[in-house]
Amino acid sequence: MGPLVVTAVLARVDERGRRTLSRKLPKAIRADLDDSKRLLSHTDVALGEAWARELSAVPVSSPAQLFEQLSLEGLGKLKKPCESHVAGQCWNDQGEAFQAEAATLARVTKHRTALAERGVQLLSVRSSVVCTKQLNHAKGQGTNRFVSDLNAMEALVLELRAQAGADVEAVCGKVGGIAEYSKFFGPLSGRLHAILGEGRARSGYRFPGLGDGWVRLDGPAGSTAVHVPSAAVVTVAAGAN
């Protein structure tokens, strides 16, 4: 298996936005904002690129610049475990170029505006990458891939909580069929929290100074969402390449 990639999106959501998110989005938006496994492939990532470019803080001129801007860890930290003679296998960007056409970019911008008009203001995006070497090292230490996935989600939630500047509400897709998530917390371990409920359908936790976290079976597959009450929502999705 390739690296684990976990992505989080921060949005400001009011009561109207909560109603928007509680039902199906308009068909035109769903055509471009849905399960990535349905909309994208390894040979066609243009739509994902368009959303990433739309949500980047400043315009970028290359995929490498876009990755650096959106990366939670930053390229320097990600390259650190690499031995020099194999680094090029992961980090060679020669020949890389943007794929999204102007029409796709314009359509995504229109979707973002439409969501804002419905009370869902998309603010920013961050991605965390856990490479195969790190996954193997974690496995050797007794941490399986599902827990590495959960821990990456936690780190992204903390990052976007800092960006939001207010308590958040996190909603995550179930990870590995776990019910008692507090046993496997990494970045959140040691933090005071109350258990709001733990079960097959969903598990919930409240963290003073951070907000509420829900892990739900009915959340998007392999994903996490974080909401700041009347302020922001973070959605985190995981996938392997």
Go through each PLM region and give its residues.
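RNase H-like, Mg2+-dependent phosphodiesterase core
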Residues: 1-241
